[in-house]
Structure formats: C-alpha cells, structure tokens
Amino acid sequence: MTSLKNDVFLRALQRQRTPYTPVWMMRQAGRYLPEYRETRKKAGSFMDLCKNTDLATEVTLQPLDRFPLDAAILFSDILTIPDAMGLGLYFEEGEGPKFERTLREESDIRKLAVPDIGSELRYVTDAVSQIRRALDGRVPLIGFSGSPWTLATYMVEGRGGTDFLTIKQMAYARPDLLHHILSVTAQAVTAYLNAQIAAGAQAVMIFDSWGGALSHYAYQEFSLQYMQQIVSGLTKESEGRVVPSIVFTKGGGLWLESQAETGADALGLDWTISLGEARKRVGSKVALQGNMDPAILLSTPEAVEKEVARILADYGIGNGHVFNLGHGITQFTPHENAEAMIKAVHAISSKYHL
C-alpha cells in the first residue's frame, strides 16, 4: 500500500521523537458535521451506514477533508461483534443501541461462539481496505473494537445507559457464566482486530467504555485481564511497521499502572485525571492519549485554545502524547470549535518537542 506522508501519530504512540503533538478526536466522524448528517440521511439508518462500504469510507474521510487531523478512525460501531454473534443489534432514535436477544440464561451463554469474522464482519474489513486506498497515505488509519467487558454489558443488559445491575449480579453470583462470555468475546475481539490489521489498519484501539463502573478488584478480574489477552494476541507488525495498540478505560484513572502492564503501546485518558500526573505514574512505559473534556468544545474558540494550552503544558516537554478528547465529541459541538482545538494543538505544541 501507499507509504505514509504523515506518520506523526504512529511515532507518538511509540514515544518516538515528533515535531509536534498529533491530534485526532474520538467520534470525529459524527453528527456535529453537517456533511455527516447528509450522508446518514442517504444511508437510511446508522447500521446501514456502517454496512455500506462506500458511505462508511465517505464519512471516515469527512473530518479529514475539513480539519488537519493526524489520524483517521474507521467509521463503525463497537457492537458489531455481538451483532455478528446473532444477538440482533438495532437502534431506536434517541435511545441508543439495543439487542433483540440477551445473554442471561446459562443455555444461551454456553452456546455463545466466536463468529466467522471473514463472512459476518466482512463489511468492516472491506471498509478498512477501501478507506486505506482512499487515504492514499495521507494519515494512518485506526481500527477499533469494544472491550470484552463493555461488549458484555450490552449483551447481558440488552441496552446501554443502565446501572449494570444484571451483569454485576452475574459477576458475583455466577462468575463462571460471565467469564465464559468474556473469554469467547476476547477471542472474537482478537480475531476481529487482527482482521482489521490485515485489511490495512495501522493502529488499533480497545474501547473499555464501561470499565469505570467496576470496583477495583472486579476491574482486574472482569475487564483488564481480557484486554491483556487481546493485546498479547494482536498482530504486532504489518507492512514493515509496528502496529501500535491503545487501551482506553473511561473512568479508569485509578488503574493506570495495571493498564500499563497489558502490553499496550498507549493508554487513553478521560478528563478526570491530570495528564501530568498520569505521565509521572506511567509515562516511562506507555504513551498517553487525551484528555480534553468534550464539553469544553461547547464554549468558545478562545476558551478551547486556553484549555489546549493548559493540557499541553500539563504534559510538558517531550514525546509520547497524542492529543484527544477524554471521550467522544458530542453532536452539539460547533465545528468551528473543533477546528480551533486542532489548530491550537499544532500551533502550540511544537515548543514542547525540542
């Protein structure tokens, strides 16, 4: 495939020297962009958009055509794996994702199997290949998946936005059943991410969106160990380059030291932790990605630039930082503020890279 014209993001993940701090945004292809809303309308539904290779490519590239971002991320959803397992993913307007079938009965749980990635999720790998061709080496492409714990919350609860009582009850009353779900899902995620790498993904990220809902010991048992299994099973090199991995637990700032032992190249941080403090704790082992509160993008360009300067100063001089939000950009964000953030990162950060 075409050689990269901008590999600053990949070098930052490996804590190599870079001329500035690279920047991208979680959910950078999304509803805050008018062009995305037009394409979504054309697709009909969110999943139709994900499963249409041409349209998924189009929306992946939209933020790059508008902003000077340093990475593209595959447009897809974290719940593609449970859907491929036959749980029947669907979306209700204003309510988020739901599943027609849940995993609560032992008989259903024991039947759970790793899906055939090549057939059931071919629409994802086809999109990865097409996006790589369309990027033509402009910036690297990130592939991703949800973590086993986060996927299991949807598989057991049947929807997002819950208090997690059903899955936590299973964790404490029948941990054997939950471990079976997590083990099968970890195998599926490993195969899925490796398929994305084979199709052209140049870095991969594991989104543990709900890991922060767990207690200290439950996090180690039901989330972290499975992410570690995935990282250890990932393809480490493709096309003659290292394929870096990022682990991100929202609300996981207490466990950075444990996360740094997973073998991941970088850790994602939300906005509840000081970036400088995180660097002191684990910066000698891993790169760090984050960690602006997405709500700041609802303010003014001036306020955004001030916060960018503060975050960059908090990390300080040196390499190994990828600027990002602490979670996904909201649909209400003025795109002018997103642009102000990206341009400010590039303008201000060079003085920290000597």
From Swiss-Prot:
Q: What is its main location?
A: cytoplasm
| Assigned GO CC terms | cytosol
Domain of life of the source: Bacteria
What keywords sit in the KW lines? Answer: Cytoplasm, Decarboxylase, Lyase, Porphyrin biosynthesis
Matching entries from CDD domains are given as: URO-D (cd00717)
A GO molecular-function descriptor: uroporphyrinogen decarboxylase activity
Give the metabolic or biological pathway: Porphyrin-containing compound metabolism; protoporphyrin-IX biosynthesis; coproporphyrinogen-III from 5-aminolevulinate: step 4/4
- UniProt catalytic activity: uroporphyrinogen III + 4 H(+) = coproporphyrinogen III + 4 CO2
Entry annotated with the keyword Lyase: yes
Tell me which InterPro entries the record gives: UROD/MetE-like_sf (IPR038071), Uroporphyrinogen_deCO2ase_HemE (IPR006361), Uroporphyrinogen_deCOase (IPR000257)
Chain positions recorded as substrate binding sites:
27-31, 77, 154, 209, 327
Q: Do the record's keywords include Aminoacyl-tRNA synthetase?
A: no
Enzyme Commission code: 4.1.1.37
**By its UniProt entry, which Pfam families does this protein fall under?**
URO-D
Q: Top EC class per UniProt? A: lyase
- Name the family the entry cites: Belongs to the uroporphyrinogen decarboxylase family.
Please give the subunit comment from the record: Homodimer.
Its function, per the record, reads: Catalyzes the decarboxylation of four acetate groups of uroporphyrinogen-III to yield coproporphyrinogen-III.
Name of this chain's protein: Uroporphyrinogen decarboxylase
* Gene field: hemE
